[in-house]
Every structure is written in structure tokens, then in C-alpha cells.
């Protein structure tokens, strides 16, 4: 049985064929404000880092044109061809992001255990690195913007770090209030940003048109082969031009594929190209400009207004990354890779606008440590690349699995694309691994730490589920016993027992029978299932089955972009003739007390870690939005 459809089917909003011209323009403007903040602020530091004095690369015409060519072709290959044209085809019912892609890849394997394990590990590590990226992006972006003050006068040098911290703390403090109002300004501000950097670059390109030779990839290849090892090191800075590429895919569900692609080709790509070429042309004319070519493009009268605009742009870029981490955290909870978290909606209209306190303050703590510890965008650049390139490589592999297994692309085509994409991704990753001791250790440490937490949680929950299933009574046997029994007293009201399995009796019910020796007039077994799709429509949300006199089984399905709301679900059951009066309904939940096993499946330290994570998880009452006054918790001791 099914409920009537009352909400839009999953993925429908991404159907670009239904988007009108005005709607397409509005979505493209919004995408410019959210999706392109990160990659749009990369010109602040990319070429500056490529010509870092530590690299020992002189600002000769051949080197300048060669590096400009590498930056241009990195953007074309990684962002335009890989993300905009290839990876964005792999939408999970309209949604993107590495965990959504992981769910697609697992589905594509058809349950092949030899593939599922490595793919899960790869996807989780990519997701963990994305969280590391979420710490570094706000730190390096805002730092690099405010460092523009130093170009005007050295007087501001001591104030760069304090001003950066003030901006970042303010940004994270407002998260709990939502960003709906200020978010309306993101698009227009970023349009002004892109038009401004394009105009600044165009001025220099017109004066030095021979910089356009950088469009020829031969100049980039010549630079690589001529400088060998040093060129390989420089590639670790070139990759900064494509940071934010993952955001295009991660935010696809908010805007749809076509608006993001339209914004890229119509404004973002031309603006970035003009600005990078303009910076390179400036260095050709004045090699001293290599110390901060972005701000040296700006006329003296416009420096401080540009610092303000750049700060606004980097705050917007930071907001996009913060929202991405919140979204990823929600997906991790729903897909079973994280303990339950306190997830709060900050908008009545936009489902994607959420606030997660633990993620928010954890990010801020890491960012403050980065700013105070590294002190400059140049120092942070070493830490930035590893997180970005690691996630990009993981995305490439997962997308290729989907292309071959789900889209039935021929193996030779997938291998060919994989060879090109992975050569670039792994080349960038290798160049950044050279910087592990200079700061690259930070995102690796964050990534490995988050991977450990997610893997431990998933493993621990699997063990716990098996332990509970081992001692569970089959539901059909229990129902037969109830038919034959006349000794169990039935009392007024409805009892809802939440259970993870649909064919076993909840342990909480058995404990209730054992201690209270009664059953309610109506007994409901409620199972909540999270599907590997972003959203489940209302018409497919609930299935109600009558098991026997007074016994019902309700199965509820959600997507990994949706949060459970049990009272709302129970109201939907009225369509099945099953009506709930909250003041007459009791919810029985089992609270597990975990104890170490004599034959552990995990090392003792991981068991302890899992226990700590379990204790700190948000209660089932709060997570499922069950009225606290109607909940009865029954303690259950479970041996891991």
C-alpha cells in the first residue's frame, strides 16, 4: 500500500528540460554565488605560489607563458572536461557529491564484494579529505584576500592574522541563524567579482597580446620537459587553480546541471582565463609583480575597494564549503557512516539549508588553528593541494566505475579517459605529496582521522546489528505464539517499537513483556530505512501491513538527503486506516549498553572508540523527532 503523492519525485528538479529561460537565468546566477566561490577566488594566490622564490623559477617570458599554459589547461582538463562534462553526468537522482557518487558506484557493481570494499574505502577517504579541504579553503581564501592590505602599505602586516580571525569567527557565528537573507546577495556579489577580475586581466592582455600563446599546450609541455623536477614541484601550485572543482559536482542538486554548466561557460571560465593571462602578462612586463600579481593588477586608487570585494568573495567561497561539509555530514549520518548528529533546518523553504553545531564549531576550531599556525596564504598553500587532489582522484575512479557498469560505456573508452584524468590527478597529487612536511600533513591527518571514525562507526554498527540479530526472535514465530496465547494482558493504547529489522521482534518488546507482562491494544513495529538515493517521494514513503489482530508493521523509507520525522510519518498512516493519537501512543526504544567482547572483531582501542562515539550520538528520540514525553527507553546490554 502507498500514500498519496504530495511532494515532487526525487530528482525532478534537476530535469533541465523543464526549466524556463527566466528560471535558468535565476538558477545560473545563484550557482555563480554558491558553486563558483572557491574556484573563483583561486586567482588570489595561484600564480603567486607558482612563482614562489623557493621554486627558483625565474620570471622569463618562456617560463611565464609556460606556467600560464599549465594553469589554463589544468582548468580545461580538470574542471571543464572532467567535472562539467563528464562527472556531472553521474547524478544520483539529481544529486551530486562524493558520497552520492559512492552510492551510485556501489549500486553499479551489483553487490560484487571484491569491488564494494575498495570502493567504499576510496569514497570514504575522498569524503574525509573533503572535510580537510573544508578547513583549509576558508583559511587560505580569507587570508589571501586580507593580505592585499600589505600591498598598499607594510603598516597592515601585523593585523592580517587578527583581521582574518575576526572575519572567520563572525562567519561561523552566524551559521546557526541561517544564510538565507545574505545568500540572496551571493550571486550579484560574485558576478561583480568575476566581471572585475576579467576587466583587470583584459587590460593587461590587450597591452601584451602575445600572452595568448599560452592557449597552445605546447608551451606548458615545453616548460615541464625543460625544467624537469622543478616543474613537477611547480605543479603542486598549479593545482590551486582547480580547487573548488568538486563543489561543481557537490552542489549539483541545488541548482541542476544545466545552470551550473551555463554559468561556467558564459562567465566563470572566460573571467578566470582573462585574469590568469592578465597576471601572467603583468609579470612579463614587470617580473617584480610575481610576489603578488593579483593585487598588482589593481590600480592604486582601487586597491582597498578590491580588498573589500575580495574579502566578500572569499567569505562567500567559505560559506559554500561550510554548507558542503554540513551536507556531507548529513549524508554520512543517513548512509550509516557517522553517529546521529544534531541537524537543524535554518529555512522553512530550502531543504538544503541546514546547520550542524558539532560540524560548525569543529570546523572553526580547525580553521583558527590553521590561521594561527601557518600565518600566511603562502604557508597554507602547501597544505591545500593534498586534500583537493586526493578527493579529485577518488571522484575520477568512482565516476569511471559508474560509466562502465551503469552507462555501459565500452571498457576501452573508460580506460582511455581514466588514463588521461588519473595522469593529471595523480600527477598533481604526487607533486603535493612532496609538501607533506611543509603543511601537507594536516589534511592527511584530518582525512585519516575522519576515515578512521567513519570506518569504525560502520564496522561497529555492523557488529552490533549481528549481535542483536543473533538473540532476536523471528517475527512469524512470535506472532504464532500470540495467537495461541491467552495469558498476555492487553492494555489500552498504542505501543510503537522501533526496530532495524523487518522479520525479527524488537528486543525492547521482549524486555517489556518480560518485565511488565503486558501488550498494548495496538502494537506497531516501525522500521526506518535510508535508501541509496537522495530523496524518496511521499507516495513511496510508507508501507503499512497488518500482521494479526492488533499488530502492524510500518516500513518507512527516506533518501540520504532527508531527515526522519516519525510523528509526520504516523500522520500519513491515516490513509491506510491506521490513525495515531499522540497522547495515547507510547514509543519503546532500546538503549544499548555496550561491553567489550571476549572474542572481539575489532581491536580493543577501536571498540572503545566506537563506545565513545555511541555515547555521544544524538538520542534516537531527538533524531527521529519523537515527543520526549511519550518515550520509554529499555536498557539492553550488548557484548561487542
From Swiss-Prot:
Catalyzed reaction equations: K(+)(in) + H(+)(in) = K(+)(out) + H(+)(out)
**Protein topology in the membrane:** Multi-pass membrane protein
Residues that span the membrane, as ranges: 24-44, 67-87, 116-136, 154-174, 186-206, 222-242, 264-284, 296-316, 354-374, 382-402, 411-431, 436-456
Query: Which branch of life, at top level?
Result: Bacteria
InterPro entries, per this entry? Answer: K+_transporter (IPR003855), K_trans_C (IPR053952), K_trans_N (IPR053951), Kup (IPR023051)
Disulfide pattern: none
Q: Where in the cell is it found?
A: Cell inner membrane
Q: What does this protein do?
A: Transport of potassium into the cell. Likely operates as a K(+):H(+) symporter.
Q: What PANTHER family has UniProt attached to this entry?
A: LOW AFFINITY POTASSIUM TRANSPORT SYSTEM PROTEIN KUP (PTHR30540:SF79), OSMOTIC STRESS POTASSIUM TRANSPORTER (PTHR30540)
**What HAMAP family does the entry give?**
Kup (MF_01522)
Homology family: Belongs to the HAK/KUP transporter (TC 2.A.72) family.
Protein name as catalogued = Probable potassium transport system protein Kup 1
Amino acid at each position: 500500500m502507498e500514500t498519496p503523492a504530495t511532494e515532487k519525485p526525487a530528482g525532478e528538479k534537476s530535469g533541465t528540460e523543464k526549466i524556463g529561460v527566466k528560471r535558468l537565468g535565476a538558477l545560473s546566477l545563484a550557482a555563480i554565488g554558491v558553486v563558483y566561490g572557491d574556484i573563483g577566488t583561486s586567482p588570489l594566490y595561484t600564480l603567486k605560489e607558482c612563482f614562489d622564490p623557493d621554486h627558483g623559477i625565474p620570471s622569463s617570458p618562456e617560463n611565464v607563458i609556460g606556467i600560464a599554459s599549465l594553469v589554463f589547461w589544468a582548468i580545461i582538463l580538470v574542471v571543464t572536461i572532467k567535472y562539467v562534462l563528464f562527472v556531472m553526468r553521474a547524478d544520483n537522482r539529481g544529486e551530486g557529491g562524493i558520497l552520492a557518487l559512492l552510492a551510485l558506484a556501489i549500486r553499479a557493481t551489483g553487490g560484487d564484494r571484491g569491488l564494494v570494499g575498495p570502493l567504499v574505502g576510496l569514497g570514504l577517504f575522498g569524503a574525509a579529505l573533503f572535510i580537510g579541504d573544508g578547513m583549509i579553503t576558508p583559511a587560505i581564501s580569507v587570508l589571501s584576500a586580507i593580505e592585499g592590505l600589505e600591498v598598499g602599505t607594510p603598516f597592515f602586516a601585523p593585523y592580517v592574522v587578527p583581521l582574518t580571525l575576526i572575519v572567520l569567527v563572525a562567519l561561523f557565528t552566524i551559521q546557526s541563524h541561517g544564510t538565507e537573507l545574505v545568500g540572496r546577495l551571493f550571486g550579484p556579489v560574485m558576478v561583480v567579482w568575476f566581471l572585475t577580475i576579467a576587466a583587470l586581466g583584459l587590460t593587461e592582455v590587450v597591452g601584451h597580446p602575445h600572452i595568448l600563446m599560452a592557449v597552445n599546450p605546447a608551451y606548458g609541455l615545453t616548460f615541464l620537459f625543460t625544467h624537469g623536477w622543478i616543474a613537477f614541484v611547480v605543479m603542486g601550485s598549479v593545482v590551486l587553480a582547480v580547487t573548488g572543482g568538486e563543489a561543481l559536482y557537490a552542489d549539483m542538486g541545488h541548482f541542476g546541471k544545466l545552470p551550473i554548466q551555463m554559468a561556467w561557460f558564459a562567465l566563470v571560465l572566460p573571467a578566470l582565463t582573462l585574469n590568469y593571462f592578465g597576471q601572467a602578462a603583468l609579470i612579463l612586463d614587470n617580473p617584480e609583480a610575481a610576489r603578488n600579481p593579483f593585487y598588482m593588477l589593481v590600480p592604486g586608487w582601487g586597491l582597498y575597494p578590491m580588498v573589500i570585494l575580495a574579502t566578500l568573495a572569499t567569505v562567500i567561497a567559505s560559506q559554500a564549503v561550510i554548507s558542503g561539509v554540513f551536507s556531507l555530514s548529513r549524508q554520512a549520518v543517513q548512509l550509516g557512516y557517522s553517529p546521529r548528529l544534531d541537524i537543524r533546518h535554518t529555512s522553512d523553504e530550502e531543504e538544503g539549508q541546514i546547520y550542524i553545531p558539532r560540524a560548525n564549531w569543529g570546523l572553526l576550531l580547525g580553521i583558527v588553528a590553521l590561521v594561527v599556525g601557518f600565518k600566511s596564504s603562502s604557508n597554507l598553500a602547501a597544505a591545500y593541494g593534498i586534500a583537493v587532489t586526493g578527493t579529485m582522484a577518488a571522484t575520477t575512479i568512482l565516476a569511471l566505475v559508474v560509466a562502465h557498469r551503469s552507462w555501459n560505456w565500452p571498457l576501452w573508452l573508460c580506460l582511455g579517459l581514466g588514463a588521461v584524468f588519473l595522469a593529471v590527478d595523480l600527477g598533481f597529487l604526487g607533486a603535493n605529496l612532496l609538501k607533506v612536511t611543509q603543511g601537507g600533513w594536516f589534511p592527511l591527518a584530518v582525512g585519516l582521522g575522519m576515515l578512521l571514525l567513519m570506518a569504525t562507526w560502520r564496522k561497529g554498527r555492523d557488529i552490533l546489528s549481528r549481535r542483536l540479530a543473533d538473540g532476536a526472535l523471528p517475527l512469524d514465530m512470535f506472532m504464532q505464539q500470540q495467537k495461541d496465547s491467552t495469558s498476555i494482558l492487553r492494555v489500552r493504547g498504542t505501543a510503537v517499537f522501533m526496530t532495524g529489522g523487518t522479520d525479527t521482534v524488537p528486543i525492547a518488546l521482549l524486555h517489556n513483556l518480560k518485565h511488565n507482562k503486558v501488550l498494548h491494544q495496538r502494537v506497531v513495529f516501525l522500521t526506518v530505512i535510508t535508501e541509496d538515493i537522495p530523496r524518496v517521494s511521499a507516495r513511496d514513503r510508507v508501507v503499512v501491513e497488518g500482521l494479526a489482530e492488533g499488530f502492524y508493521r510500518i516500513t518507512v523509507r527516506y533518501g540520504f538527503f532527508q531527515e526522519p520525522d516519525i510523528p509526520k510519518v504516523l500522520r500519513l498512516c491515516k490513509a491506510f486506516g491506521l490513525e495515531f493519537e499522540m497522547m495515547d501512543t507510547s514509543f519503546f526504544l532500546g538503549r544499548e549498553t555496550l561491553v567489550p567482547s571476549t572474542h572481539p572483531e575489532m581491536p580493543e582501542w577501536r571498540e572503545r572508540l566506537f563506545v565513545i562515539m555511541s555515547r555521544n550520538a544524538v538520542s534516537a528520540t531527538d533524531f527521529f523527532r519523537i515527543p520526549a514525553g511519550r518515550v520509554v527507553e529499555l536498557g539492553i546490554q550488548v557484548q561487542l
